[in-house]
């Protein structure tokens, strides 16, 4: 029908506009934000995070997700670490994730990105560089906004301008919190 043709064309136009945004972000190395939608294993056995950016699938290799769990062990310790990493990623599902586009394929409209690069850039801007007055933007005692990226019963994981940290449930409020899920999600 004519109506469905119009609808299809509008959707294609919208996709073209969003693809143009992605392409520009790739060219300018601009930080963009999407929602963590899943964890998948590719045919080559590599695990990747899948982020949704306005309807486009963005693939982020696990090592570019910056889930920092310390040193890189081997054997059983490595298996345990991978399990912990996947659990953390599982708790992060639905979280807003900043990333920098590292590669695009215009034919297939596929996108590969790095969260790590975005996090390091934000650290540089907010913790290491100074503003016009020569002041750091983030410093001890300053109240800043944090992005909740994962919630478990006893702990909330937040990102503060490129730095991830955990806050224990008992430190989140003056009153008793039995389960952090009830207050933070």
Q: What is each of the regions a protein language model found here?
A:
Residues 2-7:
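Short, small-residue-biased leader/transition segments that mark boundaries at the very start
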